Amino acid sequence: MNSKPEKKDIDIYDFDHTIVPFDSGTMFFVYCMIHYPWCILLLPFIGFAFILMLVGIFHFTQFKRVCYTYILFIPKEKAVKKFWDKFEKYVEPWFGERKRYSVVISASPDFFLEEIAKRLNLDKLIATRHNPKTGIIIGENCRGEEKVKRLFEEFDESEINVVDVYSDSLKYDKYIFALANGKCFHIVKGERQEFNYSDIYKEG
């Protein structure tokens, strides 16, 4: 009689305001505006796109597509490396204590997080897909329910056991918290605060 293969135990982490205490995509945007000041010429277009989002003409993913057009005008690989040379030190110390296969799922750009993922020896990175040359978003922004969808594109649901989940956002990461068979950790100012899923997300 064949026994079922043992499931892989994994922990899931958000990235921004979880592993680092800031929104890395926004920080990189500001960094590029300072170090590559010609990108400032794009700000009126980005501001207009922001207004269109506020009035409901653009959705958030469309707004992000406009924001990342600045990638066309910078030395992307050099900028990303120099950014993380400066900001890697802000990674939360407790992240180095991880004990099992770690999956980071983030709405930040894949081309931007791949560098820090290598430096931190992450097991798996799932992030918003971008065209590596143009910076344009490919598909959907990796946030909310999209995180779960992307997880199961990478792993067969029957082959993994989600143990612990870490995120700063109780609102947007409800869906990945629901996967936890171990513990849920709400990250508040860098501190891990354990909570019971059923206490926070009451039915009805």
Q: What does each model-found stretch correspond to?
A:
Residues 2-10, 80-204:
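C-terminal cap/substrate-recognition subdomain and adjoining C-terminal extension
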Residues 2-55:
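Active-site neighborhood of HAD-like aspartate-dependent phosphohydrolases
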Residues 16, 55, 68-71, 83, ...:
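A general boundary/transition motif marking the beginning of the first structured unit of a protein
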Residues 21-22, 60, 144:
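Generic structural signal for well-ordered secondary structure
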Residues 27-28, 46, 62, 66, ...:
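Exposed alpha-helical structural elements
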Residues 42-68, 117-120, 124-125:
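Short, compositionally biased "basic patch" segments
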Residues 61-91:
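Metal-dependent phosphoesterase signature
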